[in-house]
Amino acid sequence: MTNDPDAELIEAGRKLFAGDWQFFWASPSIETLPPMQGIEIALAGRSNVGKSSLINALTGRNALARTSHTPGRTQELIFFKGPGPLDAQTPELRLVDMPGYGYASAPKTKIASWTTLIHRYLLGRANLARVYVLIDSRHGFKDADDEVLTTLDKSAVSYQIVLTKTDQVKKSALDETMAAMAEKLRKHPAAYPEMLVTSSRDGAGMAEMRAAIVKLLRERA
């Protein structure tokens, strides 16, 4: 039995995501959201930033969340649920795969519909504990990301930046991106101060992200 709190969180995170995760609900509109139960954590980001791949990597399941190379494919809020509360201090978790934003080639009416759905969900979901805003480390921060962070700043929702696809950039370039992101976040005081650095392809950062989620769940218990 370890007394290292970080090691304990990592082990708890491993157990949480090693359970039976499955698709639970799809909501094309705010009116069709599932009943609020447990704690929800949402993944937001530009189209093709790697939200579905990250969910698959976190849960260790290659096809839990459907991935696509076609930007804008996810058009609904997709809910996934785990096996239930991990223990007395760690409540039930649901993951939410949100429609990608910033896909300019989609029809304007569809973009407007996605935007409305995303914003209404972010502002009106009492059991939403945190939004992980995914940023493609190859491309960095874009105007569409800034708009979403501004929306989150105006809400009561905690959010944190997750850099994705870090296996595809050199360390020097990644360091530059992280420095630029840190500077950007100075303008967004509601952002969680630490960034998560991940790769769904090689698993980098997954243990740390699972541990961070367990810590958050316990804080909300």
From Swiss-Prot:
To which protein family does this belong?
A: Belongs to the TRAFAC class TrmE-Era-EngA-EngB-Septin-like GTPase superfamily. EngB GTPase family.
InterPro entries reported in the protein's UniProt record: G_ENGB_dom (IPR030393), GTP-bd (IPR006073), GTP-bd_ribosome_bio_YsxC (IPR019987), P-loop_NTPase (IPR027417)
Its required cofactor(s), as named, are:
Mg(2+)
What is the name attached to this protein's record? Answer: Probable GTP-binding protein EngB
**What does the UniProt keyword field contain?**
Cell cycle, Cell division, GTP-binding, Magnesium, Metal-binding, Nucleotide-binding, Septation
- Kindly give the HAMAP family that the UniProt entry links to this protein: GTPase_EngB
Record the organism: Afipia carboxidovorans (strain ATCC 49405 / DSM 1227 / KCTC 32145 / OM5)
Report the CDD domains cross-referenced here.
YihA_EngB
Annotated PANTHER family? ENGB-TYPE G DOMAIN-CONTAINING PROTEIN, MSS1/TRME-RELATED GTP-BINDING PROTEIN
According to its UniProt entry, the function of this protein is described as:
Necessary for normal cell division and for the maintenance of normal septation.
Q: Which GO terms describe its cellular component?
A: cytosol
Q: Which PROSITE patterns does its entry note?
A: G_ENGB (PS51706)
Pfam families xref list: MMR_HSR1 (PF01926)
